[in-house]
Curated annotation (Swiss-Prot):
Record InterPro entries: dTDP_Gluc_deHydtase, NAD(P)-bd_dom, NAD(P)-bd_dom_sf
Family of this protein: Belongs to the NAD(P)-dependent epimerase/dehydratase family. dTDP-glucose dehydratase subfamily.
Keyword Lyase: yes
Recorded name of the encoding gene: rfbB
Key words, A-Z: Lyase, NAD
Cofactor remark: Binds 1 NAD(+) per subunit.
GO molecular function, one term: dTDP-glucose 4,6-dehydratase activity
PANTHER family xrefs: DTDP-D-GLUCOSE 4,6-DEHYDRATASE-RELATED
Organism listed in the record: Bacillus subtilis (strain 168)
UniProt pathway annotation: Spore coat biogenesis; spore coat polysaccharide biosynthesis
Binding residue positions for substrate: 85, 125, 180, 190-191, 206-208, 215, 250, 272-276
Domain of life: Bacteria
Protein name in UniProt: dTDP-glucose 4,6-dehydratase
Length: 315
């Protein structure tokens, strides 16, 4: 019998990528619960409704009535992407991040605890670990949590909440923490879409501070394949890091994109973000050694595909 999954935030960047992957590569029935924020893709939800294995429920994970509507059946798993995720927005207005990321996760954990689903996959971020110095080893799953902004603090809070349910209630849950993602469907406010947009308009690319902050980049589809593998083979109660092993400074990243587009290197250094972490790097050896995950898309191929998508979709 085909399995049935609930995907929260399935109209957003990574959630949509995962939803399409599951519909394409499995025979599972998929329900997406999404409140359709500014960063979502409602037009893609309409297209997916043509698939008889797909169902869309508009709702907010922090609202119990919406949770009840979505959990009108028992699922084989809940894959929880839904989150407020933009750091700058969290600095200026933290409340939506607490409401969605913490309270929403609580409501989902309660639903799974009550038997509405067999498993919870909680999608988190490497930002919960804080930042690294240039010569520090990459984050592992046992690195202490040390968030430096309201967004990462809200995600760390939700991680700890899920882990507390695992220890206290034996909740069947797994946490994943991934490095920076890029690819089609990412909202225009994010870094790579911003670089592409400015380059195409002949404008200087804005860089926070000196532009030498380091991030580890992973193509979103590779991230989603890792989540699918963890859903199928991961161990309940565990945390799995997912990373690209592709560290680049923000300035180096911008240079790669500008070169690909044939544009002159024009940068505008702007005031640095409050609480801006200097370096992220993920050690994904646990995922690779225990479950056999390997990324399939090189950085060069992923960037080319991403630029092509934004060119085709005029974003």
């Amino acid at each position: 019998m085909a399995k049935s999954y609930l995907i929260t935030g399935g109209a957003g960047f990574i959630g949509l990528t995962f939803t399409k992957l599951m519909l394409r590569e499995t025979d599972a029935r998929i329900t997406v619960l999404d409140k359709l924020t500014y960063a979502s893709h409602p037009e893609e939800m309409e297209k997916l409704k043509q698939n008889s294995r797909f169902r869309f429920v508009k709702g907010d994970i922090s609202v119990q009535e919406d949770i009840d509507r979505a959990f009108d059946e028992t699922y084989d798993g809940v894959i929880h992407f839904a989150a407020e995720s933009h750091v700058d927005r969290s600095i200026s207005q933290a409340e939506p991040f607490i409401t969605t990321n913490v309270m929403g996760t609580y409501r989902l954990a309660e639903a799974v605890l009550k038997g509405k689903a067999k498993k919870l996959i909680h999608i988190s971020t490497d930002e919960v670990y804080g930042d690294l110095k240039a010569d520090d080893p990459a984050f592992t799953e046992t690195t202490p949590l040390s968030p430096n902004n309201p967004y990462s603090a809200s995600k760390a809070s939700s991680d700890l909440l899920v882990l507390s349910y695992v220890k206290t209630h034996k909740l069947p849950a797994i946490i994943t923490r991934c490095s920076n993602n890029y690819g089609p469907y990412q909202h225009s406010e994010k870094m790579i879409p911003t670089i592409i947009r400015h380059a195409k308009q002949g404008l200087p690319v804005p860089l926070y501070g000196d532009g030498l902050q380091i991030r580890d980049w992973l193509f979103a589809e590779d991230h989603c394949r890792a989540i699918k593998l963890i859903l199928e083979k991961g161990t309940d109660g565990e945390v799995y890091n997912i990373g690209g092993g592709n560290e680049r400074t923000n300035k180096e990243l911008a240079s790669v994109i500008l070169k690909h587009l044939g544009c002159e290197e024009l940068f505008a250094h702007v005031e640095d973000r409050k609480g801006h972490d200097r370096r992220y790097a993920i050690n994904a050896s646990k995922l690779k050694n225990e479950l056999g995950w390997r990324q399939e898309v090189t950085f060069e191929e992923g960037i080319a595909r991403t630029i092509q998508w934004y060119t085709d979709n005029d974003r």
